[in-house]
Amino acid sequence: MGLMKKFRDYFLEEDYEDYEEEYEAPQPEEEALPKTAGKANVVSLQSVQKSAKVVLAEPRVYAEAQEIADHLKSRRAVIVNLQRIQHEQAKRIVDFLSGTVYAIGGDIQQVGTKIFLCTPENVDVSGSISLDGEDDRPMKRW
């Protein structure tokens, strides 16, 4: 051990002499304040209303259906106007969006001629709209 002492004295001579062992006295623990469980679960109704959004979409090609589905996945309601797209493409978009709303637990409703309302599960829609010329007859596949 003599070699180690010489080595330590040579390299740590100044630091070793000034070294004082620091000792911290244990501090008394502060009393923990009881947390109120009720406040953590309260959500302001005003903040919920501000975050709700409705997106208007008027796709021109089938590929834009993916963007509409992304809005639905982000919990936004989408009104889709299919009046400016060919009938076959519009049917494909409705089929795609029907699968999307089914997967997320949402709903799709026709609110006008070639106009659909797609909603995620967090949006409730009440009431119904009768289309022109249709009273209580079952809806035909448009």
Swiss-Prot record:
One of its GO terms (biological process) is FtsZ-dependent cytokinesis. Transmembrane segments: none annotated. Gene3D superfamilies: SepF-like protein. GO terms for cellular component: cytoplasm. The keyword Iron does not apply. InterPro entries: Cell_div_SepF, Cell_div_SepF/SepF-rel, SepF-like_sf. Keywords: Cell cycle, Cell division, Cytoplasm, Septation. It is found in: Cytoplasm. Its main location: cytoplasm. The keyword Glycoprotein does not apply. Homodimer. Interacts with FtsZ. Belongs to the SepF family. Cell division protein that is part of the divisome complex and is recruited early to the Z-ring. Probably stimulates Z-ring formation, perhaps through the cross-linking of FtsZ protofilaments. Its function overlaps with FtsA. This is Cell division protein SepF. The lineage of its organism: Bacteria, Bacillati, Bacillota, Bacilli, Bacillales. The gene is sepF.
